[in-house]
Amino acid sequence: MHWTRFKYQLGLFYKTVLFKLGFGKLLLKNRYGEHILLFHGIDAVGETNYNDRFVSKAFFEEFIQYISTHYNVISLNNFYQKKFKKDTLNIAITFDGGYLNNYKYAVPILEKYNVPASFFITTIHGKAPYLWTDFLDIVSYHTDKTEIILERNLYHKNEQHEFIWNDISMKNVAKALPYDVLEMIYKIFKDDWEALPPIKYEEYWMLMNAQQIKEIADHPLFTIGAHGETHASLVDIPIEEAKQEILNSKIQLETICKQPITEFAFPFGFYNQELAYYCKEIGFEQLLLVDYNTKNDAQNDKWKNRFVINPYISMEQQVACLLKGSYTKGI
């Protein structure tokens, strides 16, 4: 883990130096490639205090304008059908989570540049108005609490605003918890959440409603896919619960969209063979990951890994890394 992080930081530093030395054209030289991009949230300023999942509206528009001008940006369906162009970067765009800010900021920009995208929705609406990950990120940052107890374990707040027990963050522990236990986190931080001015923070947790999801599903540029029901790590909860989460999200979205939902993105990118084959059984034709578990998995045409957007680097660096297909490699 430490070696991977070091290579990542070294790779970005290397590109930064090259840009400053005037080698930007070399770094941005077009080349053949195939990448599905993964965005999460878009906000007004690119806030990273709460998480590493949001980029600013200005960054997003600059990025979309650049890639739509210089490369071949295609729909996810066309990407799966390998409708690629030679000697250029071929890109499909996806969003995970179902944030309202996608509807507010991303959709108008994508429409402006006529860029297709797929939105993967977490159907938690019947249980909570937010994803537990966002709730925990925001209250952990703002709470005055320094210690809390969850499942008889004592967590201490560190300088990074994370609650830690036994060198493990509460967020990592929570990924594997059943939802009824996750609801205990809501109760622990209930007063902290209610003390937050909602308008100031709503961009970081509010989700699209059914009408907005349906509007995107009906748009000729866009498609809707499923992303689970509660954003649990499906490989860490009991297998039958995981399957029910997948099925529920499909049924709920098909009810909203009035059309088949055939795309599924695994929360956190975590998957296993049994869950992947279950997705196929119930009608999902395209499965989106982050990284493949094995080299053999990369040979499955229905499974695709994705290139996660980095909110900490410039647009030029992001494009350079995308062209190279890595955050750690040089030119």
Predicted regions and their residues:
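C-terminal active-site subregion of NodB/CE4 polysaccharide deacetylases
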Residues: 1-94, 101, 139, 218-219, ...
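Metal-dependent polysaccharide deacetylase catalytic core of the NodB/CE4 family, i.e.
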Residues: 43, 113-270, 301-304
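Short acidic, Gly/Ser-rich segments with clustered Asp/Glu that frequently serve as metal-coordination loops
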Residues: 97-104, 109
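Alpha-helical segments flanking ligand/cofactor-binding loops in enzyme cores
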Residues: 108, 214, 276-277
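Glycine-rich, phosphate-binding/catalytic loops in enzymes
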Residues: 109-112, 281-282
